[in-house]
Amino acid sequence: MDAAAPDLGIGIVAAVRGGIVDIRFANRPPSIRSLVRTGKAGEIVIEILSQLDAHRVRGIALTPTQGLARGMLVKDTGGPLRAPVGRATLSRMFDVFGEVIDRKPPPCDAQWRTVHHSPPPLVRRSTRSEIFETGIKIIDVLMPLERGGKAGLLGGAGVGKTILLTEMIHNVAGRHRGVSIFCGIGERCREGEELYRDIMAAGVLENMVMVFGQMNEPPGARFRVAHAALTMAEYFRDDEHRDVLLLVDNIYRFIQAGMEVSGLMGQMPSRMGYQPTMGTELAQLEERIAHTDNGAITSIQAVYVPADDFSDPAAVHAFSHFSASIVLSRKRASEGLYPAIDPLQSGAKMATPSVIGERHYRIAQETRHTLAQYTELKDVIAMLGLEQLSPEDRALVARARRLERFFTQPFFTTEHFTGIKGKLVSLEDALDGCERILRDEYRDLPEQALYMIGKASEAEPGGSAKNASS
């Protein structure tokens, strides 16, 4: 390596323990969060995380450390990790270092900015509450998302988190004139490749940027990829004054990567092995997602819940930052009610009459009440049968079952699996359908007629032809 540059510090590797590297500098060591390079061609990148004494620092490797040995020269790059920003990044796929991974030439006119930024000050934040429509009935009616807010997709493995995120990318591209940033943290390489091809086939790649920290990469890279994606999103919000949809899959992998880094750094673990700084690290990321006077970053984040335990510290900390929570139910998935969203466990803080309006609030509350009463009656039905219920309770059960089926929806991103054409439903059409079901206007129709349709009118005789596979 070049040791002739007097303005950049040169050190030597003092110790290597897995992904943790101790480095000694003869002069002043680099500052915290600086990047240093080592290896035969400078291919090993290390981020400084702590200073041990006047001459020694400790860092986490952001790349594999094969071939690294004590005594190797280390060069300070003179700055922190940076990410490319600008219109040149649209329709491209990057890794944590801002290098393209889509087999195309790198963007030639992209700007580069540090991934470490402070959240916007309070005076720049907007306090207006606006609904961010997704085109998905159950979300827009029962747990409306807030423009500039954060929503969590909570669920265990295999209940449809990634499918729901992909559908939102498709719908938002057609409904909102903005930019989508997809951040894959700990993604399987196969899933990232499939997602890229699906989005390209759907024709929404031109207004999208994809950033991946794959599960085979070191924990340091997976920990920093979310900051890189957020830096790209902040450019479109602050410089181009555009609305941004930031999709994160999976925020639990961000916490998990931080836990690995913390363990490697020798920090004392807290409850269930998580890092003691988990709350701070998550807040530093989440508070940068905001609605300002320039634009808004609206974030939808998948949260893997270990063993479906919602009291897990990672789920609890993530949940505290969300303005809406979308809880996916394995039981509903087993019943074929897709999207498998639990309407009673899910909710939104902005679902108040002053924000969403009296009519929307009334319909949502009546719907929840009907579904909650049906849940209470399920045990009675299982033991005694439906015939033992009063006529009023039987009518309530019929309404609830029709509501459950009306809230199913065919997705554009699953057309090639199901053979059913995807449907995008406006909030007004979704509210109208719920209201008509609550008024028993469809009591003479079989409940299956409301399954996997868009508008409620499609279930009526002479309405849109329903796919036979429903």
From Swiss-Prot:
It is found in: Cell inner membrane. Its EC number is 7.1.2.2. It is a peripheral membrane protein. ATP binds at G155, G156, A157, G158, V159, G160, K161, T162. One of its GO terms (molecular function) is proton-transporting ATPase activity, rotational mechanism. Gene3D superfamilies: 2.40.10.170, Bovine Mitochondrial F1-atpase, Atp Synthase Beta Chain, Chain D, domain 3, P-loop containing nucleotide triphosphate hydrolases. One of its GO terms (cellular component) is proton-transporting ATP synthase complex. Pfam families: ATP-synt_ab, ATP-synt_ab_N, ATP-synt_VA_C. It catalyses: ATP + H2O + 4 H(+)(in) = ADP + phosphate + 5 H(+)(out). Keywords: ATP synthesis, ATP-binding, Cell inner membrane, Cell membrane, CF(1), Hydrogen ion transport, Ion transport, Membrane, Nucleotide-binding, Translocase, Transport. Produces ATP from ADP in the presence of a proton gradient across the membrane. The catalytic sites are hosted primarily by the beta subunits. This is ATP synthase subunit beta 2. It comes from Nitrosospira multiformis (strain ATCC 25196 / NCIMB 11849 / C 71). The gene is atpD2.
